């Protein structure tokens, strides 16, 4: 098994189904899927059971009871259930382009984690995307998006699907090479070395916090936001609040000031 793809989800079966269809047509086939389920109802379990029989890749469903936003805890549990030494992390609202897994494997390197991004779609187009659109890669084509009402902008260059342009844009982009939960990957040993995700973190920078501790441990990162492409399906974010952001930022500031590597409340506590 070359890689484990860890996908977070919470009560969003329509989006998760589209995402899993995207992983069923990847150019790289040697991977497993680990669903990190933050307390969804049985509807998600039923979907995974239905799709598992059709997929050539193994799907592992890791679930815990719903006690509010506990993404970091379920991610830590999913890491422990994974069967590969290299892990890709993404979300259940991000449909991968066919070469998504291939690109992560192509650019992986000892001593580095990979930092990707997403191409955000409005809710109207998110709902329009069909199984055929995913299998045929229509939803990654600028012509299809434009026909369906998407207004092209400078970010649309992400979908040009030209490797030379992608490499150039990866090189010149001013975007920080942070750990982004919707599209990042790294070696399991490097994640375990910092004790995984911080269980105290709620929504807002919880993924980047782990990446910052990896930097404190001497890790470097590569920018692949124009090479490993996924499209983001729109949704509400009722679990975010200014108070939560304030607490998360306080933790990150403390880590930076004190060069914290291992969290005291991480993967060894789940």
Please give the residue ranges for each predicted region:
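A conserved acidic beta->alpha catalytic loop
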Residues: 22, 37-48, 94
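Glycine-rich, basic loop-to-helix element that forms the pyrophosphate-binding segment
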Residues: 65-82, 99
